[in-house]
């Protein structure tokens, strides 16, 4: 399924259900772009029929130069804003940022967000059916890199008729994608906005990813990557998500939200009981305890229930093999090594850049974001850096923040572009 370059995937606001705000993009329909030719991944493996699922918000203008590409993080997808149906419980993952009158104003910009190749939300990935076998690709899916994500999304933009990107925007893995987009397609990219990200995956982040991968791969349900749809290493994937989710928070935010509050019993907390009703039999091991155990290893603390709930909900929307592929792509991201130095990596960049770090982010700490901005400045690029004070951790870029919204709006709408002399780090 494809669309015309000027397609508007939102319904008119007058036809949206009553619970939607006037600044929502409304009801949106995901679209599919099937690449007309085989896509060759960085490591040389070709794939026929690579599909990218995406959404657009707003309308492409006549000059086709006001597009904003939104790049999602590890567990994100193409559904960045709006609602798929009137009964949806939640809007897109960045709905607070994208819409008419919002920081990324869909009255001014044509906004695109695509699920990356290797994902599991409609784009071709390990869980997709291999037409040659009629079975999921599993580990026969080509090795994946951030560069593959960038090149595939550029083909989508070409298909949509985008002549020039006004801005490429992303946080976390999306920030890596945005950086590489500005490097690989300098004449196409006017502005770069990367948040809560890094120029190279460090040892600690790789270590967290490896623990998650081992949780998946040691689950008997993984079966070397061959498992049926809605099956597989569900316990392992839940544990991987529980562990990773901790890295997205901060000590202060967790202490404020949970502290050492305990759970006396499920009966005393109906809401909690509903959250922990693990209907999947495979997940019963998360709550299991031998009857004769001298110590109590059942749920005691609210933070435990929160993490188990995170694991439970994640396995219902994400594929374990996609988790393996995408985290490995993150591990291999290293601009310094790939280009010889960060200055050499950023040498082709023509875009004006805004890099944003968050003080409590311990997954990609502010100093890693600052290093990106400093390298861009050393390479002679128009660059600004902002460090926002927050105790919400790595996920700060996804959460409500008027300070962040004002920063993004100002960067997107500023004219003319700044010069390197306008900013100090």
Model-identified regions with their sequence ranges:
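Short beta-strand/loop motif that positions the catalytic acidic residue
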Residues: 349, 355-357
């Amino acid at each position: 399924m494809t669309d015309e370059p000027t397609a508007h995937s939102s319904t008119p606001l007058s036809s949206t259900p009553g619970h939607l705000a006037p600044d929502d993009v409304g009801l949106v329909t995901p679209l599919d772009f099937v690449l007309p030719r085989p896509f060759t991944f960085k490591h040389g493996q070709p794939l026929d029929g690579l599909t990218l699922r995406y959404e657009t918000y707003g309308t492409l203008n006549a000059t086709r130069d006001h597009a904003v590409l939104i790049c999602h993080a590890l567990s994100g997808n193409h559904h960045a804003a709006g609602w798929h149906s009137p009964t949806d419980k939640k809007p897109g993952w960045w709905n607070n940022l994208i819409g008419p009158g919002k920081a990324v104003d869909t009255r001014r910009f044509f906004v695109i967000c695509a699920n990356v190749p290797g994902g599991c939300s409609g784009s071709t990935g390990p869980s997709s059916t291999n037409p040659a076998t009629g079975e999921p690709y599993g580990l026969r899916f080509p090795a994946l890199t951030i560069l593959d994500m960038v090149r595939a999304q550029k083909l989508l933009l070409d298909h949509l008729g985008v002549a020039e990107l006004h801005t490429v925007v992303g946080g976390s893995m999306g920030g890596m994608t945005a950086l590489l987009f500005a490097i690989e397609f300098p004449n196409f990219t006017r502005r770069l906005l990367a948040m809560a990200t890094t120029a190279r995956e460090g040892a600690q982040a790789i270590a967290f990813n490896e623990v998650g991968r081992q949780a998946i791969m040691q689950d008997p349900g993984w079966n070397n990557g061959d498992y049926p749809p809605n099956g597989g290493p569900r316990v392992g994937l839940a544990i991987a998500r529980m562990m990773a989710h901790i890295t997205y928070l901060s000590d202060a935010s967790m202490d404020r939200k949970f502290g050492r509050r305990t759970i006396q019993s499920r009966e005393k907390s109906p809401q909690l009981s509903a959250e922990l009703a693990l209907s999947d039999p495979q997940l019963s091991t998360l709550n299991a305890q031998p009857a004769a155990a001298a110590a109590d290893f059942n749920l005691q603390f609210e933070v435990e229930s929160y993490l188990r709930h995170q694991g439970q909900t994640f396995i219902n929307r994400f594929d374990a093999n996609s988790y393996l592929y995408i985290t490995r792509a993150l591990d291999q991201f290293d601009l310094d090594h790939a280009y010889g130095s960060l200055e050499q990596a950023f040498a082709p960049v023509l875009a004006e850049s805004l890099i944003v770090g968050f003080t409590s982010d311990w997954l990609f700490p502010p100093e890693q974001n600052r290093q990106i901005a400093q390298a861009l400045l050393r390479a002679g690029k128009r660059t600004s850096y902002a460090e926002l004070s927050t105790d919400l951790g790595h996920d700060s870029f996804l959460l409500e923040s008027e300070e962040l919204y004002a920063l993004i709006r100002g960067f997107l709408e500023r004219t003319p572009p700044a010069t390197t002399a306008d900013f100090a780090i």
